[in-house]
Regions:
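Short glycine-rich His-centered loop
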Residues: 2-31
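Alpha-helical cap/lid subdomain in secreted, periplasmic
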Residues: 3-6, 39-54, 67-218
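Active-site beta-alpha turn of Rossmann-fold NAD(P)-dependent dehydrogenases/reductases
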Residues: 14, 59, 132
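Short helix-loop boundary/capping segments at the starts of domains
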Residues: 19, 46-49, 61
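Short catalytic helix/loop segments, enriched in acidic residues and glycine
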Residues: 26-46
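Short beta->alpha junction loops
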Residues: 56-64
Length: 218
């Protein structure tokens, strides 16, 4: 069980994987969406119910790293998170494939660092979690090769950023790859990108494994 601090504000940020078809209003039945962030909010919330914890989901379907920056003040800085968890990157590859309008790995890194600098300038004690972008398979060979040959650069950038900012890095590619000999990868990532219910559960477990010790030692 992960123990949180009194009045922690835990913010999940990212793209559609984090969005999870979340509600855009105040209805508490829907505001967290479905996915790993809902699993974490429900478990951590129940285990810390006396501590007035707030869980916020601001994942936005289709977002690239540049889109995240465009809404950063409203959807991050103004919310004053004490714990910030980010999963972003796969859409930059998708947009580059379709429209040449995503960031390459170098620009991804520059914007990512800018996002974190702004957060830490307002609250240097913000606990940051950087989740690794990941990919399964695509049936189209050319598209599959494009993703598999390119995503490594984004993953390396995310890991390096986590190291430089003393953030927790949550590796996810190896998690899904470890199931390739056990099951059809599409049972975990139904279209090669978006997790199934089981896939989200695996992400939530990995998040807790990586975060627990450092989060509790704040």
């Amino acid at each position: 069980m992960i123990k949180l601090k009194e009045n922690d504000v835990i913010l999940f940020q990212g793209d559609s994987i984090t969005d999870g078809n979340r509600g855009r209003h105040s209805d508490p039945n829907h505001i967290h969406g479905h996915g790993y962030q809902y699993i974490l909010a429900s478990e951590l919330g129940a285990n810390n119910i006396e501590k007035n914890i707030e869980f916020i989901n601001r994942g936005n379907s289709g977002d690239r790293i540049s889109d995240l920056y465009g809404r950063w003040k409203e959807d991050c800085l103004n919310l004053k998170p004490t714990v910030l968890s980010i999963l972003i990157g796969i859409n930059d590859m998708i947009f580059n494939w379709e429209h040449q309008s995503g960031s390459d790995a170098d620009r991804y890194e520059k914007i990512y660092r800018l996002l974190l600098d702004e957060v830490l300038s307002e609250n240097p004690d913000t606990f940051i979690v950087i989740m690794e972008p990941f990919f399964g398979d695509k049936p189209e060979e050319e598209l599959d090769n494009f993703f598999k040959s390119g995503i490594g650069a984004f993953q390396e950038k995310a890991k390096k950023i986590a190291e430089d900012y003393n953030a927790v890095f949550v590796p996810l590619q190896d998690l899904f790859d470890s199931y390739r000999d056990k099951t059809d990868i599409y049972k975990l990532l139904w279209d090669g990108v978006h997790p199934t219910t089981a896939g989200h559960q695996l992400i939530a477990r990995r998040w807790k494994e990586c975060v627990k010790e450092k989060l509790e030692s704040r």
